[in-house]
């Protein structure tokens, strides 16, 4: 999306997946750096490519680079739009007879990592006999700068929230006496499904991060980490006990309720 918006080439962009035979080395996607770091590199690369397109188009039009514009399909003279050359002809010309290739490389690093922000509110229903927790609704408001792709940003937030819910309530790894994990499939390692979660609402409070591509910040970790304290606080508000170990299972809740009632009795 960053490259498309920068170069104004929505129908001419094809993204190829990484290929270890040809792609540069990449240590991985982590630390909420994909959009913030890689996106900025893509923006710089697209700006440089756009400049190359205009420069070669100006040569073909026999005019100055400063006197042409690019609309995503053609390079044309600013004072005479009828004087133009198509992107296809520019690409063909770049193959021979000219020293301006339509191929660019850029890198980007940032000493800064501006934090995203998120507010989460959980509504739960706790069965004090069985300890079962039903998440009725989870509302979130996220500040990740300017969302590059609003639809994908919303889906990523919803997916991260689901991961956070699983981390809080169900996901756990235990080991037997041999040191082997007992949760060796999704039958034992339970992740939340759609029927386990009520309504999830995500809204965005847009800001502008000048160091990010188009004002974007990261979003990866904050949407996973926020459900934990929100759900934990909701359970504490319901039964009066705060938990300090994850996951907060029905067994732990039922035992906590029994201990509280026993102490009161």
Question: Where do the protein language model's features map onto the residues?
Answer:
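Short, small-residue-biased leader/transition segments that mark boundaries at the very start
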Residues: 1-9
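C-terminal catalytic domains of large/alpha subunits in multi-subunit enzymes
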Residues: 8-265
């Amino acid at each position: 999306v960053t490259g498309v918006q920068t170069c104004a080439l929505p129908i001419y962009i094809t993204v190829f997946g990484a290929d270890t035979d040809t792609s540069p080395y990449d240590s991985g996607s982590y630390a909420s750096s994909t959009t913030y770091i890689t996106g900025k590199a893509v923006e710089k690369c697209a700006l440089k490519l756009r400049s190359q397109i205009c420069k070669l188009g100006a040569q073909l039009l026999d005019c100055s680079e400063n006197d042409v514009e690019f609309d995503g399909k053609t390079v044309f003279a600013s004072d005479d739009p009828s004087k133009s050359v198509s992107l296809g002809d520019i690409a063909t010309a770049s193959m021979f007879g000219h020293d301006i290739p339509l191929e660019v490389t850029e890198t980007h690093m940032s000493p800064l990592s501006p934090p995203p922000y998120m507010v989460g509110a959980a509504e739960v229903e706790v069965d004090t006999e069985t300890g079962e927790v039903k998440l009725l609704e989870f509302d979130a408001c996220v500040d990740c700068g300017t969302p590059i792709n609003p639809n994908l940003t919303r889906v990523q937030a919803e997916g991260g929230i689901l991961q956070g819910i699983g981390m809080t309530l169900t996901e756990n790894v235990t080991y037997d006496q041999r040191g082997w994990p007992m949760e060796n499939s999704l039958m034992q390692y339970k992740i939340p499904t759609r029927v386990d979660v009520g309504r999830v609402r995500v809204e965005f409070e847009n800001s502008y991060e000048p160091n990010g591509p188009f004002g974007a910040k990261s979003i990866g970790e904050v949407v996973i980490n926020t459900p934990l304290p929100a759900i934990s606080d909701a359970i504490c508000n319901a039964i009066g006990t705060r938990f300090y170990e994850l996951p907060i299972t029905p067994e732990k809740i039922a035992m906590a309720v029994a201990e509280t009632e026993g102490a009161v009795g």
